[in-house]
Regions:
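A short, polar/charged loop-to-alpha-helix boundary motif
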Residues: 132-138, 202-210
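Phosphate-binding site of ATP-dependent enzymes
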Residues: 84-158, 185-191
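Short, intrinsically disordered, charge-balanced linker/junction segments flanking boundaries
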Residues: 41, 215-218
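Active-site nucleotide/adenylate-binding loops and adjacent lid/helix of ATP-dependent enzymes
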Residues: 21-109
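Internal helical hairpin/lid segments
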Residues: 144-149, 158-179
Length: 218
């Protein structure tokens, strides 16, 4: 979309073409994060041309179950599933149209998301979804009853660490405007799940909520 807008001369907000492309491609962004020593969940890429019988041993060797399966290029947690060994095959069928997907180790712990606005560390929010995780329904359905906790209960040192990682990731990809980085906080470590260059701006969305808490109206 950013490329189309640039070609027809229409200004737009948030990140440009290259940063947006890097962020939406989870494999590319993960490689960048690994190169710069950003802690992320272990993962493998799976092609549906590969034999499924080889996948289970590969997962067990790499990180074990449960796992998270997800498309390489999607947003809003569309077609993201937490799987164990017994239901992995059935869940994979739902992602077959993508041809290639990512399979990640499942990191338990607290779900915390942090927002950057330009060169400012805007703030963070913790999520406690009633569902298994903060999926599409939890994000966009008011009946999902996800608890939003702000301010986040972290020490000043850990909060500063969280915001520094978020700012670093924002800059590594060359982002501008607003970004939101999604983390799991487990055993005193922040695991970066992904960065969103077009974070939601609905009534249930997180960046507006963080902004209002910081005294910025949307």
């Amino acid at each position: 979309i950013q490329s189309i807008l640039e070609n027809i001369g229409i200004p737009y907000t948030h990140s440009g073409v290259i940063a947006s492309a890097k962020a939406i491609d989870k494999e590319i962004s993960k490689k960048i994060f690994i190169k710069h020593k950003i802690l992320i969940p272990k993962y493998i890429k799976y092609s549906f041309d590969d034999h499924f019988t080889k996948l289970i041993p590969k997962i067990k060797k790499k990180f074990g179950f449960p796992v998270v399966i997800k498309p390489i290029n999607e947003g809003s947690s569309v077609n993201v599933y937490i799987c164990n060994k017994s239901n992995l095959k059935n869940k994979l069928k739902k992602l077959k149209p993508y041809k290639e997907i990512l399979i990640e180790e499942f990191i338990s712990g607290r779900e915390i998301q942090a927002a950057i606005l330009g060169d400012k560390k805007l703030g963070a929010i913790e999520l406690k979804p009633k569902r298994k995780f903060y999926d599409y329904e939890a994000k966009y359905n008011s009946k999902a009853q996800t608890r939003h906790i702000i301010p986040v209960d972290l020490s000043k040192r850990k909060f500063n660490e969280l915001m520094s990682i978020s700012c670093r990731v924002h800059n590594l990809l060359g982002c501008r405007g607003v970004t939101r980085s999604d983390f799991k906080f487990y055993r005193n470590n922040f695991y970066l799940l992904e960065i969103n260059t077009q974070p939601g701006m609905t009534k249930l969305s997180l960046v507006p909520e963080i902004s209002v808490y910081k005294g910025i109206n949307f």
